Amino acid sequence: MPNAIAQFAGANYLNLETFRKTGVGVRTPVWFAQDVSHSAPSITVFYLYSEAGAGKVKRIRNNPRVRVAPCNMRGDVLGAWVDGRARICQNDEAAYGQQLLTRKYSLLKILGDFFSRLMHHKQTVIAVEID
């Protein structure tokens, strides 16, 4: 699946499709950072973050199956869909995911974090594993 993963290089957004209990997909464009130092080279991990109470977080808790594709800011898909499994990160992994996202988006991420804290919004880091 190297070509499927290569399509994300240089992309700023990925379209995350999570699934309702009915099986209907819900697509959301999100910022992401790829973990290129992952210990298993056959696994690609994308980190993203969201407000803890967001629908996508609730859907991931109910069903970890997701699909991702590179997209633009509006969510227009720019490549092929890839299947994956998502999980809510805790502790050190959440901090690592935040660090990768801050490194990629720098000032925009820092400002977003500031306003999230100001509004008392709790953030959740999500890892998406692609085999």
Range-by-range predicted roles:
Residues 4-5, 45-50, 54-61:
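Covalent nucleotidyltransferase core used to form phosphodiester bonds in nucleic acids
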Residues 11-52, 66-70, 79-82:
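Short beta-strand segments
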Residues 1-15, 111:
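Extreme N-terminal tail/first-helix region
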Residues 53-131:
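Short, structured beta-strand-loop surface elements
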